[in-house]
Amino acid sequence: MDRVRPLAGGRNVRIREAVLNIDPYVPGKSKEEIAREYGIEPDEIVKLGSNENPLGPSPKAVKAAKRELERLHEYPEPLAPPSLYEAIIDYLADPPYPAGEPVEITREHLVVGGDGADEIIDVLTRVLVDPGDPVVIPVPTFSQYGISARACGAEVRKPRFDPERGFELDEDSLFEALDREVRLVYLCTPNNPTGNRIRERVVRDVVEECRGVVLIDHAYVEFADHDYTPLALEYDNVLVLRTCSKALGLAGARVGYGIANPELIEHLHRIKPVFSLTRPSAAAAEATFRDRDYIEKSVRLMIESRKYLYRELRKLDRLTPFPSEANYLLVDVSNTGMNASEFTEELLKRGVIVRDCSSFEGIEPFYVRVSTGTLEEDRKFIEVVKDVLEV
């Protein structure tokens, strides 16, 4: 039943119960926010909290975006420019990252989102889910799945990534949650925030058993040792979700894309907002997809950073980092005598931002997520952690 809430003007406005029961997304903290709160110059802050590309955007992307500023008075393409579709198609046909699996697709296999991958998550959920429909979201994972599902009034079933087994996905709880009524399964691999993969056999078993759609979120696939993108062509009930926010360095441009069978894509386009992809963002994305040297350099840097951080954090007795296939590490801080909130607060006082994972559903309040950085940023982070731990 919906509740009635009085607004400032004295009117009673009906707010849907499903909306009132949603916990809002908790984003990572920005440099500007920390600068205001702690009186630290933004240039002195090390931000390792939002899984961004520490190299910054491709210079070619910046140049391309600037060219489009002269046309801000004109609407962009309703969905995406044809040249951007072609750039994505070429990128997927010859992927410039270690585990990339080539796929041959057409424009009809693609949906491009102008609010990053979040837009596609939201549109896919609204296309498939009616109030009361069951969906499956293993936890802990990316919070946007639950927000979109609950906004549609879904019944959310929550199998778990098991912390006792290094956050491996618990197959028993996963398949107990699946039945013929499930409309949508959200699988993030590598998983955010844990960094580990979901094994291909498990993914295939879910896809073959599920009568609904399986969303495979590959936001971090450029850093991984696996690539399940070809499953979008092998199965008609799979959508593989990708983003330009991580390896491609365009988190601020908000560009995501999905690969699926053309019939499903057609249904997404029925309700996907038109003109949501701005001219500068589309131009920046196209230029980045074409800049293979930049992508290869970015991926190499972040994988090297991940290895360095894992190695150095393992040397500190009171911290437990988990192996990762993404551009971040999950770290257990329970042996420090602090919870995640207290630990991150100590880092913030010293000008270092990491992600307190307490807001993730299904995880104890003793985990932080550390993004990869430049070697200079990584070294400062380790020094600050040692200071906090008084090592």
Swiss-Prot record:
Q: Which Gene3D superfamilies match?
A: Aspartate Aminotransferase, domain 1, Type I PLP-dependent aspartate aminotransferase-like (Major domain)
Per the UniProt entry, the Enzyme Commission number(s) are: 2.6.1.9
Residue list for modification N6-(pyridoxal phosphate)lysine: 246
What domain of life is recorded for the organism? Archaea
Question: What is the official name of this protein in its record?
Answer: Histidinol-phosphate aminotransferase
- Keywords in alphabetical order, please: Amino-acid biosynthesis, Aminotransferase, Histidine biosynthesis, Pyridoxal phosphate, Transferase
Membership in a protein family: Belongs to the class-II pyridoxal-phosphate-dependent aminotransferase family. Histidinol-phosphate aminotransferase subfamily.
Biological process terms from the Gene Ontology for this record are:
L-histidine biosynthetic process
- Pathway the protein acts in: Amino-acid biosynthesis; L-histidine biosynthesis; L-histidine from 5-phospho-alpha-D-ribose 1-diphosphate: step 7/9
The chemistry this enzyme catalyses reads:
L-histidinol phosphate + 2-oxoglutarate = 3-(imidazol-4-yl)-2-oxopropyl phosphate + L-glutamate
Task: Tell me the cofactors it needs.
Answer: pyridoxal 5'-phosphate
GO molecular function annotations of the record:
histidinol-phosphate transaminase activity; pyridoxal phosphate binding
